Amino acid sequence: MVVATALCTVALSGCVAPAPDDAAYESKAASTAQAALSEARTALLGVRTRADDRLPSTYLEPVLVDAEQALGEIRTTFDSVQPPPTRAADKLRGTLDPLLESAASDATELRIAARRERPGALGTAADDLAGIADELERFAQEHGT
């Protein structure tokens, strides 16, 4: 997980330059959505594995912390990209940025629920994150090449 997060961060750190046109920005947005999707699915896998009693709670917490941090970094990196001055770029950003924010927030809720050992809250947060993950997947598919 740590290696995946590091690779994701390194891969996305190259996305800080301005996007010269809509196609480049759309490509960066699709890559960002895919990276966020990967982190969200990792967190959800940890929660499901814990719910099946196949993962100790002491391991779930670091999995969730790593996903939470990675999602925050992914969002920060995407937000640092200067979009081209077009309505299409603004619309793309307006669609993806709230998804990234929700994914990061849901990952935080997962971590809090796991630390407090509240299975009901953990399940609710997992359902919320699963919905956002599905939206991230649709976004990545729609805008990927």
Question: Across the structure, where does each feature detected by a protein language model lie?
Answer:
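Bacterial N-terminal signal peptides that target proteins for export
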Residues: 1-5
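C-terminal motif of bacterial Sec signal peptides marking the signal peptidase cleavage site
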Residues: 10-14
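Bacterial signal peptide processing site
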Residues: 15-19
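Short, charged, intrinsically disordered terminal tails
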Residues: 20-23, 137-145
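Alpha-helical segments in soluble extracytoplasmic regions
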Residues: 28-108, 121-124, 128-142
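Membrane-helix boundary connector in multi-pass membrane proteins
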Residues: 109-118
